[in-house]
């Protein structure tokens, strides 16, 4: 990838003055809204605390000493109010800040708070051996690099275990998914997953049925195989895909985003990047002020990674010459 293209995405210094000004203005507006929401929550909390004290005084006068009822009631009201305010704030953040971030990043990218990425799409990647019961996706960014379209979205896959008091929700994946759509098909299906996990899951639960249809690939890079396991229905194509340059790129991505996985199937490349935070929401009511740098944040880095993958795969013409 040339130096000029590698610095196009995600560098605020490359934005023109108008784009920087619009982004800074949006951040200032959201910071003001955060302060207002914080003030409203404090006000409602104070009012609820005062009402709880009055109710408890009445209860005390009637011989009731247990304060849990007024405290619990006040807590529920404050929680519901704060949740409503938080959701409204995030909706505003997406409409004003995220849309301007996507526009500022360029390349004709577009943003939608919804995503068309389905549970079937998630399962078809074959990157997670655990059973998935529920899937949700949102915040989809679409762009184009050369002749390749790509999208980046936020997704969450979960399942429920146990029953009664032991019932709990297990998060299988939460984070970003980058999808690169080429106008050419892969002959097989190749997946790249963390090496340690594949050994643990394979030993405890056995491989998923879709994973059993793939063979473990042996590659020439000892460093790469120490970090990742590669399964494929087409051993030769897997080796064509995972060139030294591609393996170096994946290892670099893994250093920045531990747990990154990749799937090569049909005409698409999928990259999953786990995270505990939503990149398209306000970080918190009591955190640092939102700046253009924070707003662009990891989204710009993920876009940059997607475009580097596109460049690397586009150069490897032998991958496609067999189709």
Task: Describe every region a protein language model picked out.
Residues 57-76:
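Hydrophobic alpha-helical transmembrane segments
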Residues 18, 22-25, 29, 88, ...:
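Exposed alpha-helical structural elements
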Residues 71-95:
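Transmembrane alpha-helices and immediately adjacent membrane-cytoplasm interface residues
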Residues 86-114:
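Membrane-interface amphipathic/juxtamembrane segments adjacent to transmembrane helices
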Residues 48-56, 76-83:
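Alpha-helical transmembrane segments
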Residues 7-12, 39, 43, 99, ...:
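Charged, low-complexity intrinsically disordered regions
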Residues 2-39:
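Cytosolic juxtamembrane N-terminal segments of multi-pass membrane proteins
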Residues 35-53:
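Transmembrane alpha-helical segments and their cytosolic interface motifs
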């Amino acid at each position: 990838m040339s130096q000029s293209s590698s610095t196009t995405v995600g560098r605020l210094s490359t934005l023109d003055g108008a784009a920087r000004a619009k982004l800074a203005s949006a951040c200032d507006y959201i910071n003001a809204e955060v302060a207002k929401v914080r003030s409203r929550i404090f006000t409602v909390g104070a009012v609820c605390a005062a009402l709880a004290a009055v109710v408890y005084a009445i209860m005390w006068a009637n011989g009731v000493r247990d304060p849990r009822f007024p405290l619990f009631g006040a807590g529920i009201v404050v929680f519901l109010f704060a949740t409503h305010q938080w959701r409204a704030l995030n909706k505003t953040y997406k409409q004003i800040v995220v849309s301007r971030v996507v526009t500022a990043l360029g390349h004709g990218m577009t943003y939608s708070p919804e995503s068309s990425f389905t549970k079937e799409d998630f399962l078809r990647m074959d990157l997670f051996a655990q059973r998935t019961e529920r899937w949700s996706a949102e915040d989809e960014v679409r762009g184009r690099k050369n002749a390749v379209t790509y999208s980046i979205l936020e997704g969450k896959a979960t399942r429920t275990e146990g029953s009664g008091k032991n019932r709990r929700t297990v998060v299988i994946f939460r984070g970003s998914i980058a999808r690169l759509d080429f106008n050419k098909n892969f002959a097989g299906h190749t997946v790249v997953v963390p090496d340690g996990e594949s050994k643990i899951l394979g030993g405890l639960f056995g491989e998923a049925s879709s994973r059993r249809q793939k063979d473990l690939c042996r590659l020439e890079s000892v460093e790469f195989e120490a970090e990742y396991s590669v399964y494929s229905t087409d051993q030769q194509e897997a080796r064509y895909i995972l060139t030294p340059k591609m393996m170096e790129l994946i290892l670099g991505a893994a250093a920045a985003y531990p747990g990154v996985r990749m799937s090569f199937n049909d005409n698409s490349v999928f990259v999953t990047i786990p995270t505990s935070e939503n990149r398209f929401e306000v970080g918190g009511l009591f955190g640092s002020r939102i700046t253009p740098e924070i707003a662009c944040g990891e989204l710009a880095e993920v876009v940059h990674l997607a475009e580097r993958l596109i460049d690397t795969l586009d150069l490897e013409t032998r991958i496609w010459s067999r189709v």
